[in-house]
Design a protein with these regions (language model features):
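Extended intrinsically disordered or low-complexity regions, especially N/C-terminal cytosolic tails and loops
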Residues: 1-88, 96, 129-141, 157-202
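Short, charged amphipathic alpha-helical segments flanked by flexible coils
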Residues: 106-123, 154-172
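Long, hydrophobic, amphipathic alpha-helical segments used as structural scaffolds
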Residues: 94-109, 146-149, 153-156, 192-202
């Protein structure tokens, strides 16, 4: 398995938390500099695009940009959006790494990430059932946030009802804070490390 994506994700997590906390503590005192920050950001990744996108003909940076919503008063909502984006990316990385493991173990599983978790758990010691459950929870949470408007439904509840007591109720709104990203990362790393042990002896 290629661990670089999850290591890169961790570095991104730290960088975003660091930047947001300093901006929050400073009450976004330089928010008028947003436009110049965007122009500087345009040079962060070069080349900007490595294929012949028609969008490259579009002008960039000519229009003055400013915050439409005050970042101080909307910090909580912005933080929740950041958590959502990072959580989505973590699930994508986890899914790709599970696919790599399944191939190396000559296993087959369903298309959904939870099916891959269940299949790979067959080679993981039962001591780490907590990691399996946490990985399933991560997938369910991603589905709630991205596919059901932030509210639990019967399908997402079915993923966690075996170990979340009491289980969420249909229509109940989900909220996830930054500490959960660290907990889910620990679960993913633990689960995949245990799978890796099985791969080494297979």
């Amino acid at each position: 398995m290629d661990w670089e994506p999850i290591n890169s994700w961790t570095s991104t997590l730290y960088t975003i938390i660091y930047a947001m906390e300093f901006a929050r503590a400073d009450e976004f005192s330089n928010k008028e500099e947003l436009h110049s920050a965007i122009l500087s950001g345009a040079r962060w990744v070069e080349p900007v695009c490595t294929f012949a996108s028609p969008l490259m003909a579009e002008r960039f940076g000519n229009s003055k940009v400013k915050f439409r919503r005050d970042p101080s008063t909307n910090f909580r909502a912005n933080a929740q959006n950041v958590v959502k984006m990072l959580l989505q990316d973590l699930v994508v990385i986890f899914d790709e790494m599970m696919t790599q493991a399944l191939v190396q173990l000559s296993f087959t599983a369903g298309d959904h990430p939870q099916s891959k978790v269940e299949k790979l758990y067959t080679v993981v010691d039962q001591e780490f059932v907590w990691a399996r459950d946490a990985c399933l929870e991560l997938i369910a949470v991603r589905n709630v946030l991205c596919h059901s408007g932030g509210k639990w439904n019967e399908r997402t509840i079915s993923i966690v009802k075996g170990f979340v007591v009491p289980p969420p109720k249909p229509g109940e709104r989900l909220q996830i804070g930054t500490p959960m990203l660290f907990r889910y990362r620990k679960a993913v790393r633990t689960f995949l490390n245990e799978v890796k042990k099985a791969m080494l002896v297979s």
